[in-house]
Amino acid sequence: MVQSATEYGILVGVDSSAESDAAVRWAAREASLHDAPITLMHVIAPVVVSWPAGPYMATVLECQEENARHAIEQAQKVVADCLGETHGLTVQTEIRKESVARTLIDASKSAQMVVVGNRGMGALGRVLLGSTSTSLLHYASGPVVVVHGDDQAAHDSRLPVLLGIDGSPASEVATSHAFDEASRRGVDLVALHVWIDVGDIPPIGPTWEEQEETGRALLAERLAGWQERYPDVKVHRRVERAQPAYWLLEEAKQAQLVVVGSHGRGGFTGMLLGSVSSRVAQSATTPVMVVRPR
């Protein structure tokens, strides 16, 4: 079983947007699966002006606080509508007044995972929450889940969990979370290894067949111990020759959750988000869990 922080449980950033509501719905179901608390957090970003603050500033701050209360109340209603009024889940709420990204990154250290919508924050949402999501994917502690609206596949309990494996230490950590998620959902796990990311240029050295065999051996090595720990999870092993991000995005269409490491082959400790993980997190319609180290 995956060890996790417990103060915040499943931490979800809320802001009253439709994308935020979708993230709350996903987080509520996730908290129920883990029997964990859910924390609804709204962060009031500092107001930056290029002229001296006048009497109007008090009105601006009051409006921000009112919006924050509304965002929390709306998120609480979403949880109740999703799980029922008598769900029994511990719902915690918190309003902070700091940098949005910095606050959520700091809070991630005390959370089992952080869940965010792919955009939000009103009219400028794509800029603001887009940058917040990106910052979390680069710097948060532990898993970050990006929810892309109310994708129906995310609610289809029959679909498998998709795991991207590349043999890196980061994908090993992702493997533990993928097995745990599949086990809790009672679904299969598709373990996908894509073994070429340089196009269709014939390699100098091992043949395609040898490369494929190496990929299968890598999958077997990475999965052996985990299959023993989670005998209830049926694993489908897939080895493909293609662009990794493209193939993961294609397979994601038939999955309820995609799990990837924060960076892949050749990554250094502390390296920023890998290009494959970044593209999948940005482009998939299925919820994507990017597992970062703690």
Curated annotation (Swiss-Prot):
GO terms for molecular function: ATP binding. Disulfide bonds: none annotated. Keywords: ATP-binding, Isopeptide bond, Nucleotide-binding, Ubl conjugation. ATP 1 binds at residues 13, 117-123, 131-132. ATP 2 binds at residues 164, 197, 261-267, 275-277. InterPro entries: Rossmann-like_a/b/a_fold, Universal_stress_UspA, UspA. There is a cross-link at residue 109 (Isoglutamyl lysine isopeptide (Lys-Gln) (interchain with Q-Cter in protein Pup)). Belongs to the universal stress protein A family. PANTHER family: STRESS RESPONSE PROTEIN NHAX, UNIVERSAL STRESS PROTEIN UP12. This is Universal stress protein MSMEG_3950/MSMEI_3859. It comes from Mycolicibacterium smegmatis (strain ATCC 700084 / mc(2)155) (Mycobacterium smegmatis). The lineage of its organism: Bacteria, Bacillati, Actinomycetota, Actinomycetes, Mycobacteriales.
